[in-house]
Design a protein with these regions (language model features):
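Surface-exposed loop/turn and secondary-structure junction residues enriched for glycine/proline
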Residues: 42, 52-53, 59, 97-100, ...
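Aspartyl protease catalytic core from the pepsin/retropepsin fold
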Residues: 18-21, 25-35, 68-144
């Protein structure tokens, strides 16, 4: 994956509304189509949406998630397996423009609707906000 927060400040991409269902809770977020987001599911080759960690916090209140928890996704993985086994959480390797890489917590939501169409993809949760000014909460790879 190659997405960098500094590069996002120069975005001119399209925004879209995404409705996702996680742990039985439905949330609508704004996503940016980001051609620089090349993160793929290593098992299927499918697209991965990168989202703010706060989406996971809001949909899974039983985790009592804090931003500092996202710095160690390995530890959070076990907590998620116990509290929300149906989400089938996993770790996803990534690399950014400004970072050598690491692991992101990822899971497959029950449902994702993009422009009214149901999609199947993983959501990986960023330990920092993906938007430079709060205009969106997620990144979708490719173009609309």
């Amino acid at each position: 994956m190659s997405w960098g927060l500094g590069r996002l400040m120069q975005h001119g991409g399209d925004l879209t509304e995404v409705e996702l269902t996680l742990a039985g809770k439905t949330k609508t977020v704004t996503a940016l189509y980001d051609t620089g987001n090349t993160l793929k599911d290593p098992m299927t080759g499918g697209t991965v949406m990168v989202a703010d960690w706060t989406i996971l916090r809001d949909c899974c209140p039983g985790l009592y998630l804090k931003q500092s928890d996202m710095a160690s996704p390995e530890g959070l993985l076990g907590r998620l397996h116990i509290a929300y086994p149906e989400l089938k959480p996993r770790l996803l390797p990534y690399k950014t423009i400004s970072n050598a890489g690491g692991m992101l917590l990822a899971l497959r939501p029950e449902k994702i609707l993009i422009q009214g169409r149901e999609e199947r993809m993983l959501i990986a949760f960023s330990p920092v906000t993906v938007s430079d000014g709060g205009g969106y909460q997620a990144l979708l790879g490719g173009k609309r």
